Amino acid sequence: MTQRLKNLYTKTIVPKLTTNFNYSNMHEVPKIEKIVINRGIGDASQNQKIVESSLKELAMIAGQKGVVTRSKKAIAGFKLRQQMPVGVTVTLRGDRMYGFLDRLIHLALPRVRDFQGISSKSFDKKGNYSLGLEEQLMFPEIEYDKIDQVRGMDISIVTTAKTQEEGLALLKEFGLPFK
């Protein structure tokens, strides 16, 4: 799977973007640098089982073990003490990144109920894309019987693009289904 997206990038996307944006060098063409998958666990931070199940689910989805993110300071209003777990993060690069992107585009997103495409307005000024998913059940690795609660996640696709237009063109060429 990973080879398919790498070949698509080198053989199709690079020449197409080079002509569209008039790049003089193939190293100017934007590429995907990393994909960051983040899940906030919110009020479940007191329960260690929920933190472990989130870690396990993200490891199954991403194919790589995640890291528990902890609070930097105490906030009494949220009943939060310093160094309490507040989320789980996985950063993917290289082959695992391309494998996850392939599964996201071709398996997970088509399984979303009433899916009409993802918004093209979630780009920042540097061409990075952020996507929020409401449930983990869209990934084929997650079995419905094994989860305790439906939780969402945030996926950030970090590119080397300099503008929003370059980032949008790159991700459209990879096959992300924009509206």
UniProtKB/Swiss-Prot annotation:
Q: Which Pfam families match?
A: Ribosomal_L5, Ribosomal_L5_C
**Any Gene Ontology CC annotation:** chloroplast
Its subcellular locations are: Plastid, Chloroplast
A Gene Ontology biological process in which this protein takes part is: translation
Listed GO MF terms:
RNA binding; rRNA binding; structural constituent of ribosome
Q: Which UniProt keywords apply?
A: Chloroplast, Plastid, Ribonucleoprotein, Ribosomal protein, RNA-binding, rRNA-binding
Q: Which domain of life is it from?
A: Eukaryota
**InterPro entries named among the record's database cross-references:** Ribosomal_uL5, Ribosomal_uL5_bac-type, Ribosomal_uL5_C, Ribosomal_uL5_CS, Ribosomal_uL5_dom_sf, Ribosomal_uL5_N
Location (main, coarse): plastid
Q: What does this protein do?
A: Binds 5S rRNA, forms part of the central protuberance of the 50S subunit.
Q: Which family does it belong to?
A: Belongs to the universal ribosomal protein uL5 family.
Q: Which HAMAP family match?
A: Ribosomal_uL5_B
Q: How does it assemble?
A: Part of the 50S ribosomal subunit; contacts the 5S rRNA.
State what protein this is by name.
Answer: Large ribosomal subunit protein uL5c
Species the sequence originates in: Chlamydomonas reinhardtii
Identify the coding gene: rpl5
